[in-house]
Amino acid sequence: MSTVIHAGSRVLAPAADFLSPYDFFRDLTNPALAFLPRALLIAVVAALVCGSVGVHVVLRGMAFIGDAVAHSVFPGLAIAFVCGGSLVLGGALAGVVTAVLVALLAQNRRLKEDSVIGVLFVGAFALGVAIIARAPGYAGSLQDFLFGSITGIPASDVPVVMGGALFVLLMLFLAHRPIVAVTLDRESARAAGVHVLLADLSLYVAVALAVVISVQTIGNVLVLALLVTPAATARLLCDRLWTMMILSPALGASGGLVGLYLSWSLDVPTGATIVLVLTACFVLAWVFAPRHGVLARRLREKRG
């Protein structure tokens, strides 16, 4: 059902007709819709951070970790919800604890990272469901956790999200060299004196915090797309690492902006719309990328 809000002489009914960018800007500045600019800020910041972290996740071939961490933060979100605390802080605490456990357990080379992650995230998600089931009316809250809620972001979470985003970006900047070295060749990096455990821990914590920042806007189920799709698209469009690290967050932030605009105009779920926009960008890059697209490869094959 669409929500109709009267604002001055205009009736805001996003589902009634498609809003122009100008009307969307008016809605952003409408005091009666204070949640909308807040949601836009969180969506863009979350996409930017996930795009930055996702570069390392894609290069290391660890797409599964995003889904795993999204599930592993669920107990923290559930406890914070039941206790009436900050969902961002609760999820961040659970995510960091899980990141530390994964980093420590993954040092045992008899167990691959995906095995360790799979064991931990299933147990953590089950624990979160058990905890939130104790809360009255938990079904609606569970849906918000799984698929996001554009109206469910309190103003008190904005400074926490902004602080977390700055922390993640700073940590990625400071740990860039060791993380890349471990990604390219773990054993060579270890032999060169790189602290492999610290590099792994930095990446896992960055992923956990990026997921927590994103989960309220895009939801627990779809957060993997925000983490992987912009980076995968950038990977198709460029060859240099630094270019990829600039393009990926730019694509993510643009997808967050366009996705929120379309979801508000069409009255459809925000998280799903953002993911569809990013997926469309990936498909276009997969087909039309100048060097690595399908058409470019076919042309080279014909010329060869």
PLM features: residue spans?
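Hydrophobic alpha-helical segments embedded in the membrane of multi-pass proteins
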Residues: 48, 70-74, 96, 122, ...
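Cytosolic-side transmembrane-helix boundaries in multi-pass membrane proteins
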Residues: 3-14, 268-304
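Loop-to-helix entry region at the N-terminal start of transmembrane alpha-helices
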Residues: 34-42, 142-169
